[in-house]
């Protein structure tokens, strides 16, 4: 939720600024309302019936399918994904990835890296994913190549938990 849509519930000045400087969609749709299947649709360009990823609990994404990161990579782009994957498989078609297994945790979350090691990182997941993404862009990518970085945040998923310092932000509302 963003206050540029309804100011009664939240205060989001930075997101509101981005919305006022860019495009804000008042009527938009997704191919699937669940995060994993929706992500599979975006990656493949196919509906769930075509990519065979129907739900968040019984499906495993078939990484042999064509995806837009694979096409970009084949055409000289450096590709990366950092954050929530939730496709019950490991990413394919990326030069770099570090993903949150399953739904992930808001506080001190685990990440799986390209060596298939699970590493617990201390902090709030939004800040960690953001900082890891900035670090990859500034320090790890090949600056001679165009790039595509998918930054998949957890914090848009229930249950919604803020950073510890913001837990009392709306106590009086």
List each language-model region with its residue ranges.
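Formylglycine-dependent sulfatase
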Residues: 1-173
């Amino acid at each position: 939720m963003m206050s540029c849509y309804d100011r009664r519930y939240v205060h989001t000045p930075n997101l509101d600024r981005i919305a006022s400087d860019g495009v804000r969609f008042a009527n938009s749709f997704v191919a699937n309302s669940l995060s994993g299947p929706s992500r599979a649709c975006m990656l493949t360009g196919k509906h769930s019936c075509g990519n065979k990823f129907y739900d968040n609990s019984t499906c495993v994404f078939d990484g042999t399918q064509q995806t837009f990161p694979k096409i970009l990579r084949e055409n000289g782009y450096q590709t990366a994904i950092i954050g929530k994957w939730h496709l019950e498989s490991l990413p394919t078609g990326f030069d770099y990835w570090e993903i949150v297994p399953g739904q992930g945790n808001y506080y001190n979350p685990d990440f799986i890296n390209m060596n298939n090691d699970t590493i617990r990182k201390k902090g709030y997941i939004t800040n960690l994913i953001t900082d890891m993404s900035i670090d990859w862009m500034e320090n790890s990518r090949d600056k001679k190549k165009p790039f595509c970085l998918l930054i998949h945040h957890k914090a848009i998923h229930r249950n919604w938990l803020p950073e510890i310092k913001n837990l009392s932000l709306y106590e009086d509302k």
